[in-house]
Amino acid sequence: MAELEQLLDESSSAKALVSLREGSLSNTLNEKNNLPKSQTTRGRSSYVSMETPTRSSKRSRLSCEDEERPIASRSPRRSQRVTTMPQKLTNVATPDKRVSQKIGLRLRNLLKLPKAHKWCIYEWFYSNIDRPLFEGDNDFCLCLKESFPNLKTRKLTRVEWGTIRRLMGKPRRCSSAFFAEERMALKQKRQKMRLLQQRKITDMSLCKDLPDEIPLPLVIGTKVTARLRGVHDGLFTGQIDAVDTSAATYRVTFDRNGLGTHTVPDYEVLSNEPHETMPISAFAQKQRPPRFQNFLTPPRGSYTGSTQSILMDNDPLFSQSPWRSKLTGTDGETLGGFPVKFLVQVTRLSKILMIKKEHIKHLKEMNTEAEKLKSYSMPIGLDLQKRYATTVLDLEQLNKDLNKVLHEVQQFCFELAPDQGMQPADQPSELRRRCEEESQDVLRQNNTLASGEPRVQNTELTQLISRLTALLLQIRCLAEGGDLNSFEFKSLTDSLNDIKSSIDDSNLSCFQDNVEIHVAHIQSGLSQLGNLHAFSANNTNRT
């Protein structure tokens, strides 16, 4: 029995030696520990069997020298690397959910700190007007382009970069004069971009320091993220309600309850939608030709209103006010340095805009309710349809009243124009007349054959071609102009309606699909009023 135990110990020690060479000693020891207990005995023999692998290692190494040579040439480290690398990759690919939640909680707590929150704003929040300025080439890249125009690569060695920096000189940084100079340069660039957006720069040589792409101004109704200062310091989402180009600000109504409406500078407003840009070269081509510079202004002629607006006459507060007798005085009366009739029109304009804003709010709520019913596959009730139709009709009447009041306000503004040094301007109808004359000249030149006979002899067709050509010339003049207003669009709409009325009923659908819809898109693109160009012209003519 003792001899059998000795043979088992020697065989196990030999296996342990081979497994040690192959890097799997732990597996061999596990196999040895899993032997049946019936083969082990108590006392000294079991202790000897545990010590035999260390005693017999030298003898087994000498006896098995031929088998050990190929084993010694193998590298156990390499085999371990190959086997463990996939396990590490699988662990990285599937992170622990608890660890991720813990990191997210710590990050959220960090961003609650005022300094960390401001640091994130300064680092990543760029407004539409600042994004091309800060995300473009930095000062070092600009200096490289000016100092080394022939340098086409940016992959240089450290020695070559050191030589370039030595030639350029040491920059002056982190001084009060440097920061003041940078702030002034940024302020000037912002002002140049605003003037470009308003088409008020004629000399494009002043815009050499601006980026190649200039962002377009935001329009009313755009979803934005704006920064508030003061009590509510931070970034909040909202919607643009008004645009003030003179002060370079936006009137933003915020989504969060309690914030209300605030005036925010344009350099602290970021659009949530992808911002549109225009090449700076396109602004140079948008300058108005001298022959059209006096055409695109509202008329100075007197406006004969048919009826007075019911918004002021039937107002119980205004009818009982002691100021009513003063506000209905003669033409020469003034109040606070302004004509009385002008103040009346401004008050009417303010009330119409306030009422229209409430109607648009109700219309938005009804749209939300209708979309909710549609998502639930529920029918839209008759009461909702009636309220919706009533609101739409009220908005149409408000647009008509608003157009009349705008005519009156524009009339008073241009009566005050000579005192402010403004030059008198022609009516938009003059622009329309000039375009019609030019279209007739173009048609006369291109409709004549070499023999002197006309190409198109039908009079109705020649008139239609002339009117459509005049419409295109009118659109070109509006596109090349500067600031646009409702009177210019009204003249364009009047020309379109005249052409539409002269067409046969069988061709109206073709005219609407191929001409009218494209002109409407052009009007929407030219106007900076966005979706509010509905009341810029009288679009109530329907067939």
Swiss-Prot record:
One of its GO terms (molecular function) is DNA binding. GO terms for biological process: DNA-templated transcription; regulation of cell cycle; regulation of transcription by RNA polymerase II. Residues 21-82 are annotated as: Disordered. InterPro entries: DIRP (IPR033471), LIN-9/ALY1 (IPR010561), LIN9_C (IPR045831). Residues 24-55 have a biased composition (Polar residues). GO terms for cellular component: nucleoplasm; transcription repressor complex. Residues 355-451 form a coiled coil. Keywords: Coiled coil, Nucleus. Signal peptide: none annotated. Its main location: nucleus. It holds the Pfam family LIN9_C. It is found in: Nucleus. Component of the DREAM complex. Belongs to the lin-9 family. This is Protein lin-9 homolog. It comes from Danio rerio.
